[in-house]
Amino acid sequence: THGIDNPFIEYRDSLSDQNTDKDKYTLVLANPPFKGSLDAESVSGDLLKVCKTKKTELLFLALFLRILKVGGRCACIVPDGVLFGSSTAHKAIRKEIVENQRLEAVISMPSGVFKPYAGVSTAILIFTKTEHGGTDDVWFYDMTADGFSLDDKRSPIADNDIPDIIERFRHLDKEADRKRTDKSFMVPKKDIVANDYDLSINKYKEVEYVAVEYPPTEEIMANIRELEMQIGTEMDELEKLLGL
């Protein structure tokens, strides 16, 4: 229950008509199950209006938008496919969040953070329900470590990006000047729209290549010949030792 003294928990299908919650919550923190596809007949009709799909990872995003009050915020974990999927439904839910709500951040997490249960790469989406847009610059962070090894053992390690993520997110006003080669950076909405609402960090992150200087070709060839001569000499000595 994550520190909540008196949690209210109901057993029901959140994506079906059993769940009538709407405009009810000011905050949604979620790591919903992504079990694949559902029977479309069991899905609430108003969710299908947002994105017509059977995929639970997309339907849950539509659900969070429905149950939030205007001004309410959501931080939810999604599989990477949500960020760049090319289906009509994938694009529809991303467009809904970017154009009609306010997308604030995309935190990319490495595969392994949910091992030994799942090895899929995931991300955290942070957005506010506005119903009138408001997305401006979206903050991206490339998380590579969470304080534990990324294998099935999940042993504690020194590398941990989480404190840095929290610190940078608290001071987004200082993020505007960061280059896209950094761990975090801002991406303007127009760039996201131009890329068909793709939210994968690799779409925008830039890799800084360091030029490697090599010796002149003549010098390399001379070194190769010298090594060949040395090998030949040592082979002769070895044959003498073996009496060949």
Give the role of each language-model region.
Residues 1-6:
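Short, conserved SAM-binding/catalytic segment
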Residues 11, 16-244:
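A conserved structural/catalytic subdomain of Rossmann-like adenosyl-cofactor enzymes
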